[in-house]
């Protein structure tokens, strides 16, 4: 079953006796499957949580995507199931090995063992004017990472960002962290939507933005 805020290729399907968000593709992280569809667990995916909460992501399916903070491939593998070329940036070697494994059966998923804080090191690989940047980087300076990578985003593209407050400063209230991050983002982006992701991810803020 499709919904207005879900891109083509992302549906709600009956899997394991429950109606779940799902994409078509080989499983990656032990998720339940049925008839070629794999359940997308919003508790393990910030973007999955954003879809569950009804964010207007601007995604329709088939987009070119730059994914920052791909980790072991849990979320980006789902993205590559419904998107077009998907560039997955991950710096830590251990999760990057899992990411490469997740990419093997997906000809649209391109792992890059790079640091999202230094986009010039992968600028020669990533296409310009990507349709969307999806970011889940659990380090200090998350807004700065989004600003530095804005160079790749099309004028009408979308930034889909999850800000983890505790990665910025555990001594500061999350709301204060979020406001500071949004102030930095507003220097480069127009903020279209924000919403707390606490239903699935404690002390996280989901952000949808577009270049100014």
Curated annotation (Swiss-Prot):
InterPro entries: Fibrillarin, Fibrillarin_CS, SAM-dependent_MTases_sf
Gene3D superfamilies for the chain: Vaccinia Virus protein VP39
Chain positions covered by the region annotation Disordered: 1-37
Domain of life: Archaea
Pfam families: Fibrillarin (PF01269)
GO biological process, one term: box C/D sno(s)RNA 3'-end processing
Keyword annotations from UniProtKB, A to Z: Methyltransferase, RNA-binding, rRNA processing, Transferase, tRNA processing
GO MF, any single term: rRNA methyltransferase activity
List of residues binding S-adenosyl-L-methionine: 74-75, 90-91, 115-116, 136-139
Enzyme class: transferase
Family: Belongs to the methyltransferase superfamily. Fibrillarin family.
Function in brief: Involved in pre-rRNA and tRNA processing. Utilizes the methyl donor S-adenosyl-L-methionine to catalyze the site-specific 2'-hydroxyl methylation of ribose moieties in rRNA and tRNA. Site specificity is provided by a guide RNA that base pairs with the substrate. Methylation occurs at a characteristic distance from the sequence involved in base pairing with the guide RNA.
Assembly: Interacts with nop5. Component of box C/D small ribonucleoprotein (sRNP) particles that contain rpl7ae, FlpA and nop5, plus a guide RNA.
Protein name stated in the entry: Fibrillarin-like rRNA/tRNA 2'-O-methyltransferase
Species of the source: Halorubrum lacusprofundi (strain ATCC 49239 / DSM 5036 / JCM 8891 / ACAM 34)
